[in-house]
Every structure is written in structure tokens, then in C-alpha cells.
Curated annotation (Swiss-Prot):
Vasotocin is probably an antidiuretic hormone. This is Vasotocin-neurophysin VT 1. It is found in: Secreted. Disulfide bonds join C20-C25, C41-C85, C44-C58, C52-C75, C59-C65, C92-C105, C99-C117, C106-C111.
Amino acid sequence: MPQCALLLSLLGLLALSSACYIQNCPRGGKRALPETGIRQCMSCGPRDRGRCFGPNICCGEALGCLMGSPETARCAGENYLLTPCQAGGRPCGSEGGRCAVSGLCCNSESCAVDSDCLGETESLEPGDSSADSSPTELLLRLLHMSSRGQSEY
């Protein structure tokens, strides 16, 4: 009789210990597959043409990067979503940033000029100025040339 009670107690303890508790259940239950994909960050800016890079940063090719403006208010909601997101292109900078627009590297807190993010603008030589270059591209080329000149000395 005591052996039967001991066996039932062990089985009961085993059943309780393998339960899925509220605080550690994956979405869809114990047998759900883990989420492997990282979603794209929320859209922001005028006519939703940008992506959130942080709670106060919105960047897009057509608009550049907006920081702390009313257009970035929507990005604050990104902190309340449970799934992680990733905005931008390739990794850049020393603080875990990603290329936001041509020549700019942004993380969740700030943006900085980065020559790794120049993309197609980098392939143009400084003497090859064409008539269809936008003012932004010209400014980025000048910034790149000035930072390159400072690092050589």
C-alpha cells in the first residue's frame, strides 16, 4: 500500500512539473514552433514612407531621417509590441546600427554619417558630377570626402 501511494505521488508530481505555466507558454501552446522571422518595423513619416528605427527616429529614402518630430510619434508604439523588428539595410557602425538611407547609419537612439551606407553614391568619383545628382547625394559626397581627408592626417 505505501508503495502504491508513493508511485501515485511521483506521477502526480511529474504531471504538475511538465505543465505549461502562464508566464512561460509559447504562443500556440507547448508544441508550437518557435517564431524565427523578424518582422519589419512600423511605417512612419509623411504618407508612411519611412520605417521606425527607434522610439523617436523615422527614416526613409524619400524623406531622409526625422528625429523627435511629430511624424515619429507613431514609433513610440514599437516599444509595446512583443515581437522584435528590424529596419534598414545592412549592419553598420560600432553601436549595432543599420543603414537607414544612403550615407546614414541609425540605431534605436541616434544616427550618424557612415561611408559604409553610401551604396551606389560611393561608386561615383568626386569628379564625375552629373546633372541629375540630387542635392542630398552631393552633400553626402562632400561629407564623405571631408571625413576621408581628416582620417588620412
